[in-house]
Amino acid sequence: ELKKRFPHLKGNFGTAWQNQQREFEDIPAPVLFTTNCIMPLRPSYADRVFTTSVVSYPGVTHIGEDRDFSPVIAKALELGGYPEDTLIPGMNGGSVVATGFAHHAVLSHAEEIVQAVHEGAIRHFFLIGGCDGTRPSRRYYTDFAKLTPPDTVILTLACGKFRLNDLPLGTAAGLPRILDVGQCNDAYS
């Protein structure tokens, strides 16, 4: 849906908060922080970081209430992006990340969701809403998601999503089985 409204949008980049410093090191693009969890910046990419909304950081250009994103766009044009299509895998090695199902998106499909529940095409909803932690051995959310039946939907919020949002879980009743409803500070769907 976002790609229809914003054809220049190329995708979501990055995994969990604890990987920022490594992941942002070499990307030829600006990074715009819209919610929490900004890590101390490394000098190698600090000039490519922008903040907006509730996020700010010393020495970083903040996009204020006027929502003038021209500095971010100018930086993107200056850096040029990757010269070829580049696959950056998720935490589980996946290549597709489903995201962006905040209340507006969910409500726009409310009738379909309710109908699917009434018809039994969706039997249960699971909520995964905790922190993922930094150790690779912390796989509880990943393992849990893999065990959920195919006629269920997983709602994610907070950083726990990064442990499973690239898993190929398919759809239930034509809807993605993983619906990410936001971060811990903006998940009110």
Regions found by a protein language model. Give the residues of each.
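Metallocofactor- and cofactor-centric catalytic cores in central/energy metabolism, strongly enriched
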Residues: E1-S189
